[in-house]
């Protein structure tokens, strides 16, 4: 059977495509009931602006929906890099788009909010997997049980239904030699819905917090497996087939903070073959559940060489999905490609051009290509918060390491800048 590329799959009904990154909407979430959390309005503004990444997956004949219009300098920067930009519609809400029913919406995530909009505009099409199937797949506990039933290797862990079983699980994991544990609730992606526990004091604090706020306990406590590689696979699932689109490595610092994605992970031939086999096997189970479209699976290869193929499934597009066309293009010319996320606070009021000039100055003598593909900024009373995404393409690992160092130096400089 002929492979239908995802971009063609999304165009099968022949209507105008409207890309929509509703990244702030959840399919389901219970994390806030269990774990202490603080709302940060600046961070929420930053998250919305990550919709700029839609520009790289959309085709010129498509339309993208933005809540916030990117700076013209950012759009000109990409025109100079020969990116054919789609049409852009900028509104506060998707419902404000004129003649909405003439579009086929391709969202970041299918949600109750989006389905409610569909009820209001019945002729508007949405290409997305079934929400009930997504919820079943995103449920961390159901996914773990499904993998166990089908012979997949899973982390050492225990389901906990009360405070006593949670205490017992922690004691068991510490006795088994784990120095850290991960406490999970059923739902929550991108680090939401889990807490890393690195000592008993933190465990006792969390235990008391949960005990004071919950009557029903539904948790999973897992031992922390030291990672050699934190892998993510992108799958495209149709009615009849499962396709592996990409295998990437998440770059995580010692504090567990996400720093970027390595698009050329260091897997041996046998490791890559084993990983592919297990991921496609997991994908087939997901296909049988009725899922259709793109999704991401998080995996780990630990320091003992043990592969745990399914840690978490995100039944939606991922941010890696959006820049895959850009990555594929760079991999034709460069051996090493990775994205870097740069986050800093500064009193300086920087625009895209300011930062791009500083970036060019710092990396001028380095024989690598650096693309600034997302510029997010949120202004506050005393500081401005910035989050930038860059794609670094290099011919060898030495160049890549040097580029990382220069980017970190620039981050430090920007933090202390006044401008």
From Swiss-Prot:
Pfam families: ATP-grasp_3 (PF02655). PROSITE patterns: ATP_GRASP. Mg(2+) 1 binds at residues 298, 312. It comes from the Bacteria. ATP binds at residues 174-231. Its cofactor is Mg(2+); Mn(2+). Residues 144-345 form the ATP-grasp domain. InterPro entries: ATP-grasp (IPR011761), ATP-grasp_PylC-type (IPR003806). Mn(2+) 1 binds at residues 298, 312. ATP-dependent ligase that catalyzes 2 steps in the biosynthesis of the side chain of the aminoglycoside antibiotics in the biosynthetic pathway of butirosin. Mediates the addition of one molecule of L-glutamate to a dedicated acyl-carrier protein. Following decarboxylation of the product by BtrK, adds a second L-glutamate molecule. This is [Butirosin acyl-carrier protein]--L-glutamate ligase. It comes from Niallia circulans. The gene is btrJ.
